[in-house]
């Protein structure tokens, strides 16, 4: 039987809780899984501390209790023996090649896999090596409350909009005809523009719905959301800029100061995250795993706003 956990809200923070006593050995039971789900539903970001550092196998086994873990598909930047694990690092190997992805600079607000048909449901980051002088904090913003705080008329309109997400820059300027008839996940003859685990661009509704809680979130981020299809270019930019002003608002945001051994788990559907810069002469390494929705349509519901 898994040992008891202690879950404590992070004082003074808009979101987030610290979880002590979690079992990463692969023996986590169904009761503890549901307890973690409920804590995630409430706090959106969970910081696990006071546990034995899990092996790659144990980390993956733990993550799989919360959904399907896809391979990264990368030939560089992933763990050599576990392609599902992305290495977030500025470290160079003996040949001067990066061992992972990322750098020491600011990483803009985003949510993982928004540019793929099967978006990420949960993210996990495990600290391995941290810059001694600090920096590199990971920031999380609550996009459920961001949605709920919008003016009623705007919130209603957002439910009729779809947005294009892309890993490629400049793609928002493609002619309108190319947008039409691209990604569709409806109907027996639907043909996705990209494969579920191999894509770099797709289209999603602008409002997502958490299948466990029913809460709705703005599903847009400055890094990957390029265009609202139903609006002209100017109007699309105006609406997106209004939405992009939400990430980082203090009353919606938690800034995680990393400690050795920390594992952070977060709701990818209802949050966006970013990374602060750190000294590029110092080393930083984290292991990253995500889960994705089994059904690509699960987070997207056409019903009107409540």
From Swiss-Prot:
It catalyses: pentalenolactone D + 2 2-oxoglutarate + 2 O2 = pentalenolactone F + 2 succinate + 2 CO2 + H2O. Keywords: Antibiotic biosynthesis, Dioxygenase, Iron, Metal-binding, Oxidoreductase, Vitamin C. InterPro entries: PentlctneF_syn, TauD-like_sf, TauD/TfdA-like, TfdA_dioxygenase. Fe cation binds at residues 110, 112, 273. Disruption phenotype: Accumulation of pentalenolactone D. GO terms for molecular function: 2-oxoglutarate-dependent dioxygenase activity; ferrous iron binding; L-ascorbic acid binding. Catalyzes the Fe(2+) and alpha-ketoglutarate-dependent oxidation of pentalenolactone D to pentalenolactone F. Also able to catalyze the oxidation of pentalenolactone D to pentalenolactone E. In presence of neopentalenolactone D, mediates production of PL308 and possibly neopentalenolactone E. This is Pentalenolactone F synthase. It comes from Streptomyces avermitilis (strain ATCC 31267 / DSM 46492 / JCM 5070 / NBRC 14893 / NCIMB 12804 / NRRL 8165 / MA-4680).
């Amino acid at each position: 039987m898994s040992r008891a956990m202690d879950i404590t809200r992070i004082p003074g923070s808009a979101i987030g809780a610290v979880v002590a006593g979690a079992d990463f050995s692969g023996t986590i039971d169904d009761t503890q899984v549901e307890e973690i789900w409920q804590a995630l539903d409430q706090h959106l970001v969970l910081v696990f501390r006071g546990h034995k550092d899990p092996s790659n196998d144990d980390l993956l086994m733990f993550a799989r209790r919360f959904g399907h873990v896809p391979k990264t598909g990368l030939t560089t930047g992933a763990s050599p023996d576990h392609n599902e694990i992305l290495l977030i690092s500025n470290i160079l190997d003996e040949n001067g090649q990066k061992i992972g992805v990322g750098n020491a600079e600011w990483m803009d607000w985003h949510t993982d896999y928004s540019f793929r048909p099967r978006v990420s449901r949960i993210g996990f980051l495990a600290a391995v090596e941290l810059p001694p002088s600090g920096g590199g904090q990971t920031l999380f913003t609550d996009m459920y409350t961001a949605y709920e705080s919008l003016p009623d008329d705007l919130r209603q309109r957002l439910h009729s909009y779809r947005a294009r997400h892309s890993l490629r820059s400049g793609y928002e300027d493609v002619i309108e005809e190319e947008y039409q008839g691209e990604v569709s996940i409806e109907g027996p003859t639907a043909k996705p523009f990209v494969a579920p685990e191999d894509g770099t661009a797709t289209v999603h509704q602008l409002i997502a719905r958490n299948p466990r809680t029913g809460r709705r979130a703005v599903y847009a981020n400055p890094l990957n959301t390029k265009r609202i299809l139903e609006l002209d270019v100017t109007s699309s930019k105006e609406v997106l800029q209004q939405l992009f002003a939400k990430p980082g608002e203090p009353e919606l945001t938690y800034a995680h100061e990393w400690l050795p051994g920390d594992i952070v788990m977060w709701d990818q559907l209802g949050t966006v995250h970013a990374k602060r810069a750190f000294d590029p002469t110092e080393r930083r390494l984290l292991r990253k795993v995500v889960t994705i929705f089994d059904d690509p349509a699960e987070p997207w519901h056409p019903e009107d706003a409540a």
